């Protein structure tokens, strides 16, 4: 059996290419990214600010939980992973794209106004880049608010208005003075005269800055240098003991460690102090005493089961490990660790160790190969 294979000429190839280009032209150009307050043809309505449909990539960014449901965490310098126990395989959050942060700041400000300016998005304790992106987003939203109060439309700077005013002032100056002057000095003079009232309006319309209340007074920026007083990093894995919330107080004569353990029993706690590593390990187990079957459970935020947390103290001042005391009351486990403030103990004197001389059997045999044995 033979098959016939037709031969293609150059004309046939060119004709096929022209047909493909014609079909692409009928489909139209690819859709360009739309700016806020623009009509999206594939949505059928105008989307302003943060109102995006569920399949939009920015939907989850504006429909999350407000930051009022979150509390602040210490910086990275206060967390460490203890060497003993289990390994910490806590994954870090991925860095967000800077372009997405910039777009979200502008769209959120145009929609919410003052409400969106007061709302802040949560930033997680193990993600420094998210904290930096949040500050950039707040700065962009503040600029958009100022432009909205002044009356300048979005996505348009103040340069076109300044240039138009400078041209009018230049024409008036030419008619009055009737002198040949270059346009550059007039534009510079007009810009300086116009920027002053704009700056005054921005300063007058700028809202007062609110002070951020924080339970960590000296935490202003993350420091790469570890703090001498540290706690173990909170565990997020479900197959390992959970980490209860902890507060550590450093007073003049004692360290006070407070852990939140509601619904627990003091007999289920185990507190161990390791003098060699200056670490205190608190572990135990919390039992579910509600008495309702888990099949009726719909929302769960309470933690039950095994827990574990470690506190690492500085080397100095030293700690009186024999006087450590712990109390459990109202769901709070309070541990007081006293310090040795005035160390009056004298250092022990140096002790020289004498080396004992042991005779060498081989040398003795060489000196006396035939020893005489006495009867």
Curated annotation (Swiss-Prot):
Compositional bias segments (type: Basic residues): 49-58
Compositional bias per record (Basic and acidic residues), positions renumbered to this chain: 169-197
InterPro entries found in the cross-reference section: A-crystallin/Hsp20_dom, HSP20-like_chaperone
Keywords carried by this UniProt record: Phosphoprotein, Stress response
Positions with biased composition (Low complexity): 22-48
Quaternary structure annotation from Swiss-Prot or TrEMBL: Forms oligomeric complexes. Interacts with itself.
Entry protein name: Heat shock protein 42
Highest classification ranks of the organism: Eukaryota, Fungi, Dikarya, Ascomycota, Saccharomycotina
Gene name tied to this protein: HSP42
């Amino acid at each position: 059996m033979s098959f016939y294979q037709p031969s293609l000429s150059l004309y046939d190839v060119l004709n096929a290419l022209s047909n493909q280009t014609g079909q692409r032209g009928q489909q139209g150009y690819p859709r360009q990214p739309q700016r806020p307050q623009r009509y999206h043809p594939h949505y059928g309505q105008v989307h302003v600010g943060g109102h995006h449909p569920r399949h939009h990539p920015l939907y989850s960014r504006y429909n999350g939980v407000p930051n009022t449901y979150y509390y602040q965490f210490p910086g990275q310098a206060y967390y460490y992973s203890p060497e003993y126990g289990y390994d910490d395989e806590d994954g870090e959050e991925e860095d967000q794209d800077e372009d997405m942060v910039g777009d979200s700041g502008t769209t959120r400000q145009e929609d919410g106004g003052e409400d969106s300016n007061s709302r802040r998005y949560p930033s997680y304790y193990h993600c420094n880049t998210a904290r930096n992106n949040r500050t950039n987003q707040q700065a962009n939203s503040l600029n958009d608010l100022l432009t909205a109060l002044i009356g300048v439309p979005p996505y348009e700077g103040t340069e076109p208005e300044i240039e138009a005013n400078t041209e009018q002032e230049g024409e008036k100056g030419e008619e009055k003075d009737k002198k040949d002057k270059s346009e550059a000095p007039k534009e510079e003079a007009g810009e300086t005269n116009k920027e002053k009232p704009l700056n005054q309006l921005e300063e007058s319309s700028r809202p007062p800055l609110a002070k951020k209340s924080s339970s960590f007074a000296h935490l202003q920026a993350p420091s790469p240098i570890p703090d001498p007083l540290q706690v173990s990093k909170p565990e997020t894995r479900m197959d390992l003991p959970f980490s209860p919330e902890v507060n550590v107080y450093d007073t003049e004569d004692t360290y006070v460690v407070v852990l939140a353990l509601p619904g627990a029993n003091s007999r289920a706690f185990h507190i161990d102090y390791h003098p060699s590593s200056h670490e205190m390990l608190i572990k135990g187990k919390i039992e579910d005493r509600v008495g309702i079957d888990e099949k009726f459970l719909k929302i769960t935020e309470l933690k039950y089961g095994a827990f574990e947390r470690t506190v690492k103290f500085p080397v100095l001042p030293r700690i009186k490990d024999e006087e450590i005391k712990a109390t459990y009351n109202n769901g709070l486990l309070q541990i007081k660790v006293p310090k040795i403030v005035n160390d009056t103990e004298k250092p022990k004197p140096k002790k020289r160790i004498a080396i004992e001389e042991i005779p060498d059997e081989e040398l003795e045999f060489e000196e006396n190969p035939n020893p005489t044995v006495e009867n």
